[in-house]
Amino acid sequence: MSLKGNARATFLESGDPALKDYYPAWVNNLADDVTVEGSLLDGAVQGPDAVRKVVLGIRSLYERQEFRFAGPCGNNGFLEDYVARVRGEPLGCVVLVTLNAAGKAQHIAANYRPLSSLLLLSRLVREKLAGTPYAEQFAASESSS
């Protein structure tokens, strides 16, 4: 992947070894009306079963995932910053989870980089979720676009 200048993109770096065994507990603590949105899809997906299926579907496509940061953000949020590989391509993601008053994940916003890896992952997620009502919110394969 070519980059201009001497800057090194953070999605090319490794994760924090202290977070090697981290698992996002919020995935199992979703509000009844939870939503997920982000750069991988158009619009949002709502409902705990649908959101869990999307999130776990994305994670299943990773060859590896290393967290750089995971921790509280503000009074009612949680932030994750991680790097991953999808079909050998580097990927970075920042996830902001907003918690409701009961401490359940109410809203998840996930933003991926770089664009080439984002598009690849979005197409793969669409294939993985084929047959669900929200599969078409992800990018179509290159041959059908």
Question: How would you label these PLM feature ranges?
Answer:
Residues 1-145:
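C-terminal and inter-domain tail/linker signature
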